[in-house]
Design a protein with these regions (language model features):
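Mobile cap/lid helix-loop segments that gate and shape the active-site cleft of serine hydrolases
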Residues: 92-96, 182, 186-219, 225
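Primarily recognizes the serine-hydrolase "nucleophile elbow" in alpha/beta-hydrolase
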Residues: 149-192
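C-terminal catalytic histidine-bearing segment of alpha/beta-hydrolase fold enzymes
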Residues: 127, 237, 244-292
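A domain-start/cap signature at the N-terminus of enzymes
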Residues: 35-77, 287-291
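Short substrate-entry loop that stabilizes the transition state in hydrolases
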Residues: 72-75, 86-125
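The conserved beta1-alpha1 loop
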Residues: 81-85, 231
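Short beta-strand/loop motif that positions the catalytic acidic residue
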Residues: 223, 229-231, 235
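Alpha/beta-hydrolase active-site loop
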Residues: 126-145
Length: 292
């Protein structure tokens, strides 16, 4: 359970990670030009709710950090990014007991990973330009504060779609992708069009380039990292066809890719299937690191 007690503070990091962190109490819930953090506890993990000012538009944005018990910032770690689904926010992967969320948390705990869950312009992000800019900023800041060795971006539904989008846009940043029940083609996807248009800055007809560049199937050659996806044959909310095509293209390019397609499955991934997908990417990272 997440404690209801929290303290708002500003963290200003001066110089290197060994320098003193200056904490200033936050009044009236305002962020004073820096980073603020609410420290809380959940079973087996330390939780921090972080606020920051977006470099893109100067708005206050948020993400949650989860550290496993005994976590040390100086030790090299894998960073696991958990992206929420449509209509949710940063708390989905922290609090919810649905299989996709529980598997992700327990996977991070199992390997002592650092886990973050951003709002990325909740609740209707679909990894539009603002969400993309925020996530890039977050990852840069986290790398300054922690010894991050590799980055896995994961999520379900909109979050899985967004993981693929961000990975294709920034293969130099992302080392592995886990996408549960995603779409891989924003040009053909037909649901949530009003929300997506708001996020992308216009409709498919108005800004076609945004929909194309955010269609991972059409940018598959940029997915050079291990990729694991789950799909359901009877998923009508986010149909699997584009992702099945993406997998075939990645296999044709001899990429490390894992598919768990449940022909009778709907818009959900079981705990076991989610954990299997996460393990595939983790193993891919271990093999890559051993070859370096």
């Amino acid at each position: 359970m997440i404690s209801a007690k929290s303290v708002d503070v500003v963290e200003r990091w001066v110089g290197s990670l060994t320098n003193l962190v200056l904490f200033v109490m936050m009044g009236f819930g305002l962020v004073c030009g820096g980073w603020s953090c609410q420290a809380q506890e959940i079973t087996g993990m330390k939780l921090s709710d972080v606020s920051f000012v977006s470099e893109l538009d100067k708005t206050v944005q948020k993400y949650v950090v989860l550290e496993s018990d005994g976590f040390r910032r100086s030790t090299k770690k894998t960073l696991l990014v958990a992206l929420h689904g449509h209509g949710a926010d940063r708390w989905q992967y922290v609090r919810e007991e649905r299989d996709e969320c529980r598997a992700t948390r327990e996977f991070a705990m199992k390997y002592g990973m650092l886990m973050i869950s951003p709002d990325y312009r909740a609740r209707t992000s679909w990894m539009g330009p603002a969400a993309e800019a925020d996530l890039k900023q977050i990852l840069a800041e986290v790398r300054e504060l922690y010894s991050v060795e590799s980055i896995i971006v994961s999520g379900g539904s909109m979050g899985g779609t967004s993981a693929l989008i961000f990975g294709a846009l920034h293969p130099d940043i992302v080392d592995g992708i886990v996408a549960m029940n995603p779409t891989s083609n924003m040009e053909e996807y037909g649901q949530f069009q009003e929300a997506i248009a708001e996020s992308y800055g216009g409709s498919k007809a108005e800004v076609p380039q945004e929909y194309r560049k955010r269609s991972s199937e059409l940018q598959f050659e940029r997915l050079t990292m291990p990729v694991a996806v789950t799909t359901g044959g009877k998923d009508t909310l986010v149909p699997p066809e584009s992702t099945l095509r993406l997998v075939e293209k990645l296999r044709g390019a001899d990429r490390k890719v894992f598919l768990n397609h449940r022909s009778e499955g709907g818009h959900a991934t079981t705990y076991e299937d989610g954990m299997q997908a996460l393990e595939f990417v983790a193993e891919g990272l271990r093999l890559r690191q051993s070859e370096q």
